[in-house]
Amino acid sequence: MADDLPLEQQPKAWQRVPCTSCHRSYKFYCPKCSIPLGMPEGVTVPTLRLPLQVHVWFQDKIKKSTAPHAKVLAAQDVQIVPYPPPKESDEALPVYTRENAVVVYPSFEAETLGEISADEVRDIQTLIFIDCPWQKAPVIMTDPAIANLRHVKLAQPPKESSFWRYHKAGAGCVSTIEGA
């Protein structure tokens, strides 16, 4: 059983296997289909329920993104929204209201949740993250579906990390879903 292995050997116990949905071969999970793959015997990937819906507006390389990690763990509550929507897709962008959705983005007008009234925080149902290279984010933020939504930011910057991609504007400006 993989849990009995030392921590540094546990990733080696996972096998690279074809995805049951798209048939591409991956180790750990399929970034396209957001399903775990090649789990060792006795290992289960937890399924999480989140208190809010998480929509990740995505315009990057899927294998470079951490959005699929969130989708694998909380499939019912995480939606990856391709941006711009593929031309061949019938799916429109989700519809949000200023009362029930906020964009987690460190803009100049961004507030911390502590600066928003408790009643307004209770009304929030969806957190929207922008997953793209930093230089593309301002363009996405002008999309009519999210342009008029409130922006929220982290109250305290995360500790230094070699994993997160920081923006030149400061350590509190992270560009990965772990910022949540």
Feature-to-residue mapping (PLM):
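Short, charge-rich amphipathic segments
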Residues: 1-8, 26, 109-119
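Cys/His-rich short segments
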Residues: 3-53
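Electropositive phosphate-/nucleotide-binding environments in soluble metabolic enzymes
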Residues: 13, 27, 64, 170, ...
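Glycine-rich, flexible N-terminal cofactor/catalytic loop recognition
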Residues: 31-98, 116
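S-adenosyl-L-methionine/SAH cofactor-binding core of RNA-modifying enzymes
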Residues: 71-146
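C-terminal folded domains that constitute the principal catalytic or ligand-binding module
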Residues: 120, 125-127, 134-180
